[in-house]
């Protein structure tokens, strides 16, 4: 993988980082940060294989695009713009759920508050092992560029 800290697209300045969740979690893991087990996949059979390999029973099937709000987004057909389903992050309880969610996510467009009405085509999934959540915390960081 190329260095994500050196920028990617020509219009991105030095230090810009634009990577998917699965790539970020790989970097965290390599740096010794504890992350849930997960696998990147690009097709439905890959998602089912990831579910089997993770062996956790419950998994999150996550669309991978460069925008936030995936969980609250709406998936639409890229041609007709007909609604496919709500949410680009789904909790799967079994293999059939994984297959269904992967089929509905991959190859379709997800529209979120950050993508605007055009949305973004989903070509990548991250299948992540589930866990029991006793407490949930959120962290936000604001960079003051002034």
Describe these PLM feature segments.
Residues 2-5, 15-145:
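Active-site nucleotide/adenylate-binding loops and adjacent lid/helix of ATP-dependent enzymes
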Residues 10:
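Cationic, low-complexity basic patches in intrinsically disordered or flexible, solvent-exposed regions
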């Amino acid at each position: 993988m190329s260095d994500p800290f050196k920028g990617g697209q020509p219009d991105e300045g030095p230090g810009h980082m634009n990577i998917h969740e699965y790539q970020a979690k790989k970097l965290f893991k390599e740096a010794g940060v504890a992350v849930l087990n997960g696998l990147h996949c690009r097709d439905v059979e890959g998602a089912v294989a990831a579910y089997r390999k993770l062996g956790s029973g419950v998994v999150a099937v996550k669309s991978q695009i460069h925008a936030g709000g995936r969980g609250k987004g709406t998936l639409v057909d890229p041609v007709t713009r007909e609604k496919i389903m709500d949410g680009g992050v789904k909790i799967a309880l079994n293999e059939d759920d994984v297959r269904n969610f992967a089929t509905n996510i991959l190859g379709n467009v997800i529209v979120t508050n950050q993508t605007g009405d055009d949305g973004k085509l989903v070509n990548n999934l991250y299948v992540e092992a589930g866990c029991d959540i006793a407490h949930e915390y959120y962290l936000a960081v604001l960079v003051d560029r002034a």
